[in-house]
Each structure stands twice: as C-alpha cells, then as structure tokens.
C-alpha cells in the first residue's frame, strides 16, 4: 500500500532517458520522440556518450554528469547494463525508474539495489506509462491519447497496445495508462490506492494475469471501489492458459470470489473489455436497474430483450401517465410498450418527442436507444436529434443513456458524434445490454457489500479446545483425520455430526450395531483412500447382524483387491441418518496458492469439480456474506432451493457456513476440510462424513487469509470511574443499529465538534462506512456495555492510516451523558497504543477552539496543540515514536 515514489513516477517534473539515441529503431530514440511529442513540460535529459544531442536536446555522457537529479529515469539500454545503471541512479538520488526490459535472472539483484536506495521501479518488461493530463508519454507507443477520466492498468504489453489502438480510433481519453510489466516492485495495489484519490480519475480498468500479494490487492481494491467503479479482466482461467502465460495464478473461482469481495466487476473476454472501456469512459452512474428501450425496429429490440432476459435484467414499467403522453405524441400504429418500437420510418421528430416525454418521467433508471440503418430515418440525423434533446432537457445530464447505432459504415458518423458528446455508444444490441448489466452487477455488488449483516444466533466457538485437539493429533504424527476423529473439533464450533464408532473387524462392527440399533452405515477407515466410494467403501441401510458382517467382509475384500497396499484402520459405524426428503450438500475448504483458504458450497453426491459445481467465497464470512454465497449457489444452479419435502433453510445454512469460516480462521493447522455429505433436513444440518487434512503451522495465522479477520485479541475489559465495566473492542459490521442508537444519544453540540457541521441524520451508507471497515487500513474501537443479551455503545474512537502507514487521522466521540467517567481518555490510550504498535509515526486530528475538553485531553496525552484562529481549528499531532520512548 506504499505510495513512496508514485508521485515522482506519475507526475514527474523532470525525466532522464538512459540510453537515448538518434537511431530510429532504438528504444532510446522511440522514448525520446514520444516524450517530446507528448508535450511534457519539464526537462527531458538524454543520457548517452554516443551523441552530443538527441532530437535537438543536449545530451549528457553519463548519469553522474547530470546537472540535477531527475524525478524519473527510463532505462532504454541493453539489459546487461541495468544493475550498474540502477546503482548510478541510486547514488545520484533518483527515486523512480522505469525498466523496459530485464531477464528474470536479474530481478532479485535489481530489487535489492532499488530498496537499498529507496528507489521505486516500474517493470521490468514494461511498455511504460502515459499520463495525458501531464502531457506525459513515457512509453513505446506512438499513439497519442486524449485526456480522459478512465485509468487503465495492465500486466500485458500486447493488451496495452491493443487498447491504445482501439481508443485512438474512438478518440477515447484516459487519465493514466500504465503497463506494469513484471511488477517487480510497484504493483497494482499501490496504483489503486493512488488512483482512488486522483481527481482526474473517475473509473479504473484492470487487466490482470497474476498477483504477488492477494491481501494487499483485495484491501486496496475494496477501498478504491467504494468511490470509483473498477472493472477487471483476468486471463489464465484454464490451466493451459496459465502455462502459456507462465503464471501460477490460482484457481479461477478464487479470483471470482476475491473480485466480488472487493466490490469489483469482472468481464470475461476482450469484447466485454472494449464495452467496459466505453461504459466506464462515458456512462453516468446508475440509480437503479430498470431499463427502458427505444428502437426503430422490432428485431434489434428483440435481440436486446433476449440478452437482458438471459442476464436476469429488468425492464422498466411505464406509468399510465407516460403511456398516455406517448399515445398522444406518436402515430396511432405504434404500440406503446417497453421496448418501444418506433418502426423503421421513425423520423427525427418521433425521437425528439419520445425522448422529451421519457426524460420527464421517473419510470426508468437507464435508457437504451437503438437505431438500425434506414433510408427513412438517417442515423446521423437521429443522432443529432438525440444529442440536442439530451443537452436541452433539464434532466438530460442526469439520465443514464446508452446508444446502439447498428451497422458499420452508415453509423460511423453517428458514433463519432456520440463520442464527442460524451455518450456511450455500442455496435450491437447485445453488447449494449452487456454494458448495462455490467453496471447493474457492479451496483449490486456494492450494495451487497454495504448491507448490514444480521447477528447470528447461538454461535458456538471453543477455539482453545479445537487447538488442543489439532495439536495433539499433529504431535501424534497425524496428517488426516476422519469423521470419528474430527467430531470433537466440529462440535467445538457448534457443527453437528452423526455419532460414530470405530470397529476393528466385522465382529466388532456387528457388536456396535447391536448396541446402537439398526439400520446402520459402514464406512471404510483408511488414510490412503480419501474417497471411499472409489472402492465401494460405504454400505448403507444395513438392517441385520448378518448384513453388517457380510458388508464389512465385502469392504475389506474389495480394498485388498483394488488397493492392496492401502492401510486399513477398520470401519466407521454410524446410525443410519434419516434421508427421507433431505438434501445432500457438500462444503469444502481448499487452500488456494494465491488467495489462501476458500470456502466452497455445492451439491453432494457428484464428482467434485469446483469450477463447475460450486460457489466460492473467501473467509472470514459474516451472515450477510454467507447468505449471499447461498443465494448465488441457488441462482447459478449449483445447489437446489429445496428438497423433495422441504425448502432449503437459507438462514440455517448461512449460519453453518459462518461456523465453518470461524473454524478455518481460528485454526491455521487445517489445510483442507471436506464435509460430504452435509445432510440438510428442514432446519437441521448434519455432517455425515468429514475429512480433515492438517499440518503444523508456525507464524502469523492471519497472514494466510486474503481478508484480515476480526482481531479478537484486541478486546479488553475496562473499568470506568463509576465502577461500571465495559468492553473495548474493534467495531463490527453488525454494530450499525447500536451505532445509530449511540449517535442519537449524542448532543447536537458534540456532533458539531466531531463532524464540523450540523448533521440531521446519518444514512445507511454513512453508518456502513463507519462499521464495515478494513482492519488492515483503519481501526475503530467501541466501548460497549452489555445489557442482558444486547450491547449498547458508549463511545467510539477511530484512526485511518495513510497507504504508507506513516500518519493516521484520529477522532473520538463519547456519549454526551457519560462525560467525566474517563471513557474518552481510555479510548484514546487504547488507540494510541494500537497505532504505535502497528508502526505508525504520527497521529493527527483537528477540533474546534471552543472544544476545550478535547484540547485539554490532547495536551494530557502528549499531543502538540496548534491553535489556528484564522482557520477556526486546532491541529493535534502526537509523535508516536517519542510517545514510545516516554
């Protein structure tokens, strides 16, 4: 998340081209030509001993002779000289460098050198970067691009060149165009942090092949996507494609889960990528998902309608008033409906009247206008009419509009007009619908992430017991545990299993069956055969002693024939579960090499292919995220919504997934968990067969997770001055109702001191931003008092760190009727300790001069107090390093 050096890279004031040349085919010539042609305002310093000047600019023989230190250096020489040149740049004090090419064998040495000099690197094997707002073309691309609001980050030079060429033809603009190359140092997460705060960037498009740090990516993407739409195209979905790209990018469903968790939207192919660029460049934000379609032909509208239906889109319903106005304005033969077919003889006036009426209504959230080539209604004339109406109408600048002028040659001028007017335009009805549904899905993802999770009921977790059982098994040399051994671990987290007994032979199996009652199930117990069904190692509905004996002997015989070297540790004996009307599910936890643990949900009784048969999520899960996973499974037909007798208990299954998530988060020794089948019968969920793979784990248990979990270790009981005890803990997404109630008990004066303005009401979005935090980026502690089965919030303090983890902005607020109990000071002391322990250097805040209580508290805690009377504020700064020394 570091931003060190990015300003010098993306907004350099001076540039040195190392290896500048006058030979047209050389990289140094191409880079100089593009820098000068791009209109860069600062000094460009060619460095070459071969020429006294390059393209009319005085050259310098070596790096040491440069008259001053450049902000940015670009290595255009033979890769064999990279390390020596990087050393010279570091000695000169240069802080950023673009490396255009370097073999993999150099990577480690280059990175060590750069870190020694605190230099940032883009590349190697980077096409470079373009920043049109700075007049900067520090790339090989001769294609000039316009200034725009879309930033593009790519890990592929080929894709970068393709997009540049495509954008030039459409006169599409960018705020930044960055080719990462091998991402040896600067990576996509840092650029997302930078672009999220960049005023020239309103949307971001990513082309990704791999990640070096999944957790940093998810954290940065989630933060940026709260303010700006981000679309991702990820190649390497198949193992063959990963081999071709020479990447180990992890499971494709894991990417889907991470992209969704971060609030991004994934596009699947190059066609969708081009549509996405058009959409992000021009489309206005959506207010909802209701689409109105206008067309001058039934067939194109039908194609759009089919695509909308296949993607589960929603048509707008016109009100009676709107329908009446349209009937009065349009010819009688036109059927007033949605889609609205104006027929192939639709004139300019028909389009204008229709648009005027629709723009004045509140019946839709987005408007799609289709035009097919027609002699009676020329496309260019209709395009002019649409653009003029949108500009003239009072609501024109607020409507989300998509245009689809079909055809190629006859529609070129119309599409050019739309691009000039800043209106999104597409070549096909299906492509237009795809673009619309991209934004609908993005909006849904964002809304889903901001929903307040319900508090799960009766969640059980005995982490200490589970740890002890796992450590004991590992100490005994176990690497895999079966159902019988896993039972107490699952029970520690409230997960139900069938009682299971171990039988060494057929006689013992008969004895156990007689004790527990018939019918029973027998299952092979072997560490070498994880899938018992492969050797017919499961026998069900055994109703007599004779059946049990025969089944046991048959299992042993089949294993000896099919797998003679397998170790057989006897049989598992279970009472036969009542499967009548029940649904069999499967819950699996796998470890992905990029994203860590994944939770998968699918149907039981099938061969397991996660890419096709499961929905996937990243832990940790809360009830909201778990419910979303279940609903996605139903929508994608990965699980059924009901069995023969009962509807699926979505809440109950969501709670079970939360329990599985808690187990995985708390117990890093678990490498893989397979619950199959999980029997769902009405509101009961029972694990019939479970396999658990385990291994010793040494290190930070949170480091293996792509999303930082709730930090339980920061909880602390505190006694206030009046003797009451309250719990200091990190804030939770589930705290939103309690936070709203807390704010209602704070006076307007205290709220004014906190927020510097009068706030009548906090929206759900406001409260979601306060409670649904990324613990890697910010921390909020709440003081809560427990009353029976509920909690009330007494005070809140929070700190939001910058991406470099140097400074944090803090704030504190205590319930107005609880002042004088020392609560504010204790909360601040906890926040100071937390920020200091996490390596931050300074804690900063502001308040008002008449907030004397806060100013006095800050002084007591060691803050430097800077009263700025002209600004009407008081600056508060705490040097955490000095605080640590004291």
Q: What does each model-found stretch correspond to?
A:
Residues 1-689, 697:
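Catalytic-core regions of core metabolic enzymes
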Residues 73, 675-677, 690-692, 810, ...:
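A structural signal for short, well-ordered beta-strand segments
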Residues 522, 573, 692, 783, ...:
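Short beta-strand element of the conserved SAM-dependent methyltransferase core
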Residues 698-886:
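Long, contiguous binding/interaction regions
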């Amino acid at each position: 998340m570091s931003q060190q050096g990015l300003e010098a890279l993306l907004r350099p004031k001076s540039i040195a081209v190392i290896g500048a040349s006058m030979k047209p085919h050389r990289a140094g010539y191409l880079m100089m030509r593009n820098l000068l042609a791009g209109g860069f305002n600062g000094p460009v310093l060619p460095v070459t001993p071969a020429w006294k000047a390059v393209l009319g600019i005085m050259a310098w023989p070596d790096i040491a002779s440069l008259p001053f230190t450049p902000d940015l250096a670009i290595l255009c020489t033979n890769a064999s000289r990279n390390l020596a040149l990087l050393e010279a740049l570091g000695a000169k004090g240069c802080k950023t460098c673009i490396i255009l090419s370097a073999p993999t064998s150099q990577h480690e040495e280059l990175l060590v050198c750069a870190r020694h000099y605190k230099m940032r690197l883009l590349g190697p094997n980077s096409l470079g970067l373009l920043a049109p707002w700075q007049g900067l073309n520090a790339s090989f691309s001769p294609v000039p691009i316009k200034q725009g609001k879309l930033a593009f980050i790519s890990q592929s030079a080929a894709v970068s060149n393709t997009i540049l060429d495509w954008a030039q033809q459409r006169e599409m603009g960018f705020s930044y165009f960055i080719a990462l190359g091998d991402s040896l140092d600067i990576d996509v997460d840092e650029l997302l942090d930078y672009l999220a705060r960049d005023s020239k960037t309103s949307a971001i498009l990513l082309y990704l092949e791999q990640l070096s740090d999944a957790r940093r990516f998810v954290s940065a993407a989630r933060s940026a996507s709260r303010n700006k739409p981000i679309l991702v195209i990820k190649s390497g979905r198949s193992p063959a494609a990963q081999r071709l790209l020479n990447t180990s990018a992890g499971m494709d469903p894991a990417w889907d889960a991470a992209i969704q968790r971060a609030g991004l939207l994934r596009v699947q192919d190059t066609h969708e990528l081009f549509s996405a660029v058009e959409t992000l460049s021009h489309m206005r934000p959506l207010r909802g998902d209701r689409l109105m379609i206008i067309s001058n032909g039934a067939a194109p509208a039908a194609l759009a309608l089919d695509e909308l239906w296949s993607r589960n889109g929603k048509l707008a319903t016109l009100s009676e008033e709107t329908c009446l106005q349209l009937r009065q304005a349009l010819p009688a033969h036109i059927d007033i409906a949605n889609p609205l077919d104006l027929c192939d003889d639709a004139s300019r006036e028909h389009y204008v009247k229709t648009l005027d009426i629709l723009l004045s209504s509140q019946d839709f959230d987005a408007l799609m206008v289709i035009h097919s080539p027609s002699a009676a209604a020329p496309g260019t004339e209709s395009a002019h009419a649409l653009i003029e109406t949108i500009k003239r109408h009072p609501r024109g600048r607020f409507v989300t509009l998509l245009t689809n002028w079909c055809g190629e040659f006859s529609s070129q001028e119309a599409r050019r007009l739309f691009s000039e007017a800043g209106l999104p335009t597409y070549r096909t009805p299906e492509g237009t619908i795809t673009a619309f549904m991209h934004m609908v899905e993005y909006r849904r993802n964002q809304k889903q992430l901001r929903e307040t999770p319900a508090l799960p009921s009766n969640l059980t977790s005995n982490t200490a017991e589970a740890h002890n059982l796992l450590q004991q098994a590992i100490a005994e040399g176990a690497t895999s545990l079966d159902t019988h051994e896993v039972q107490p671990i699952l029970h520690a987290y409230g997960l139900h299993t069938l009682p299971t007994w171990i039988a060494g032979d057929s006689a013992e199996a008969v004895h156990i069956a007689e004790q527990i009652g018939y019918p029973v199930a027998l299952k092979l117990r072997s560490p070498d055969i994880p899938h018992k069904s492969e050797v017919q190692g499961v026998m069900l509905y055994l109703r007599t002693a004779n059946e049990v004996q025969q089944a046991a002997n048959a299992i042993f015989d089949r294993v000896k024939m099919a797998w003679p070297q397998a170790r057989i540790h006897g049989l598992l004996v279970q009472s036969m579960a009542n499967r009548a009307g029940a649904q069999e599910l499967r819950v699996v936890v796998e470890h992905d090499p990029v994203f860590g643990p994944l939770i998968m949900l699918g149907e039981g009784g099938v061969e397991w292919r996660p890419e096709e048969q499961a929905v996937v999520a990243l832990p940790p899960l809360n009830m909201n995220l778990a419910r979303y996973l279940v609903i996605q499974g139903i929508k994608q037909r990965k699980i059924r919504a009901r069995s023969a007798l009962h509807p699926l208990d979505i809440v109950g299954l969501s709670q079970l997934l939360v329990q599985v998530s808690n187990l995985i988060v708390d117990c890093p020794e678990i490498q893989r968990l397979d619950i199959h089948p999980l029997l769902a019968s009405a509101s009961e969920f029972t694990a019939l067969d479970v396999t658990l793979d385990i291994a010793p784990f040494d290190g930070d248990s949170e480091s293996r997770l792509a999303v930082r979990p709730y930090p339980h270790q920061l909880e602390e009981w505190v006694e206030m001055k009046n003797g009451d005890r309250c719990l200091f803990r990190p804030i939770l997404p589930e705290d939103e109702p309690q936070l709203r109630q807390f704010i209602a008990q704070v006076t307007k004066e205290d709220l004014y001191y906190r927020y510097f303005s009068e706030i009548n009401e906090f929206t759900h979005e406001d409260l979601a931003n306060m409670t649904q935090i990324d613990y890697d980026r910010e921390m909020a502690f709440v003081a809560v008092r427990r009353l029976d089965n509920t909690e009330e919030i007494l005070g809140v303090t929070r700190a939001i760190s910058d991406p470099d983890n140097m400074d944090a902005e803090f704030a504190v607020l205590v319930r107005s009727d609880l002042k004088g109990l020392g609560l504010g000071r204790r909360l601040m002391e906890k926040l100071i300790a937390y920020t200091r322990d996490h390596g931050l250097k300074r804690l900063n805040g502001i308040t008002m001069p008449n907030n004397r209580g806060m100013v006095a508290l800050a002084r007591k805690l060691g803050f430097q107090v800077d009263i700025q009377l002209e600004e009407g504020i008081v600056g508060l700064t705490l040097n955490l390093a000095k605080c640590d020394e004291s």
